[in-house]
């Protein structure tokens, strides 16, 4: 998977994810307002603060992880384990809100889909970005490498 400590690429990926999510949200907004399906619209709008929080967290994640270099490995492992569990609980909050707080106002399926859209898009982009980044780095390193002839490349008679 992609190395999220590379700050420039992480910012680019986070902004791509946010823009794609906003494009989908605007499409749903136009569809819901033209067909009067406001429950679906509310279902899609409910996870938006959590997605924005996740994007901000993704942008600041590299700096945050660098602070843990001096701690022991066991403490860091415990922290990261709880961090990843808490991240998925953060994605669960909008679904629980839509399900328990007046279900007639929120379309629960739209809330689930829009909540899952962000982490799935992050996974897809990171797995698509990794081979592209690897290929580009190899291509650049091959272009910058100068060919130096050595004695091993000559035929010996």
Swiss-Prot record:
Q: Do the record's keywords include Membrane? A: yes
The alphabetized UniProt keywords are: Cell membrane, Membrane, Transmembrane, Transmembrane helix
Places the protein is found: Cell membrane
Q: What is this protein called?
A: Uncharacterized protein MG406 homolog
Question: What is the organism lineage in this UniProt record?
Answer: Bacteria, Bacillati, Mycoplasmatota, Mycoplasmoidales, Mycoplasmoidaceae
User: Where is the major localization of this protein?
Assistant: membrane
Q: Name one GO cellular component term.
A: plasma membrane
Q: Is Cell membrane given among the entry's keywords?
A: yes
Q: Which residues form a coiled coil?
A: none
How is it placed in the membrane, per its record? Answer: Multi-pass membrane protein
Q: Where are the membrane-spanning stretches?
A: 13-33, 39-59, 81-101, 112-132
